Amino acid sequence: MSHDPTPISDNPAEFTLDPVIAARLKLNDAGLIPAVVQAVDTREVLMMAWMDTHALAYTLATRRGTYYSRSRDEYWIKGLTSGNVQEVTDVALDCDGDTVLVTVHQTGGACHTGARTCFDADPLLGPGQ
């Protein structure tokens, strides 16, 4: 007889970050840290979003890109409603402890507009400009 493991909650607020990792973070006054999201295959920067300790803990536990929406004041598990899922392969903290780099396999667009990346297709400065 097989035993099904307890399903993982879809509520990031129920997850607590390991205290050793939490001690390394330098959160802003709102308790958030910027997360730069990069494609594992192309190294293209896909988006920047915010995480709190619960979103980071959930991401580390589930390998699902999870962020905190400041405008909606809620957690955002990338792809939960859009299907544009981020399978997280790596998470690294920068040398100052104030930014995380999240490397992902991106399904569909990373941007809420549906585009592959959130960064402007019409750059402010580029080669030859």
Curated annotation (Swiss-Prot):
Cofactor annotation comment: Binds 1 Mg(2+) ion per subunit.
Pfam families, A to Z: PRA-CH
Pathway: Amino-acid biosynthesis; L-histidine biosynthesis; L-histidine from 5-phospho-alpha-D-ribose 1-diphosphate: step 3/9
Gene Ontology CC annotations of this record: cytoplasm
UniProt keyword terms in alphabetical order: Amino-acid biosynthesis, Cytoplasm, Histidine biosynthesis, Hydrolase, Magnesium, Metal-binding, Zinc
MF annotations from Gene Ontology: magnesium ion binding; phosphoribosyl-AMP cyclohydrolase activity; zinc ion binding
Superkingdom field: Bacteria
Enzyme class, spelled out: hydrolase
Catalytic function, reaction form: 1-(5-phospho-beta-D-ribosyl)-5'-AMP + H2O = 1-(5-phospho-beta-D-ribosyl)-5-[(5-phospho-beta-D-ribosylamino)methylideneamino]imidazole-4-carboxamide
EC number: 3.5.4.19
Main localization (coarse): cytoplasm
Location of the protein in the cell: Cytoplasm
Gene Ontology BP annotations: L-histidine biosynthetic process
Residues bound to Mg(2+): D94, D96, D98
Cofactor entry: Mg(2+); Zn(2+)
Residues given in the record as Zn(2+) binding sites: C95, C111, C118
Function of the protein: Catalyzes the hydrolysis of the adenine ring of phosphoribosyl-AMP.
Quaternary structure and partners: Homodimer.
HAMAP family membership: HisI (MF_01021)
UniProt record similarity statement: Belongs to the PRA-CH family.
Protein name as annotated: Phosphoribosyl-AMP cyclohydrolase
Species assigned in the record: Corynebacterium efficiens (strain DSM 44549 / YS-314 / AJ 12310 / JCM 11189 / NBRC 100395)
Gene from which this protein is expressed: hisI
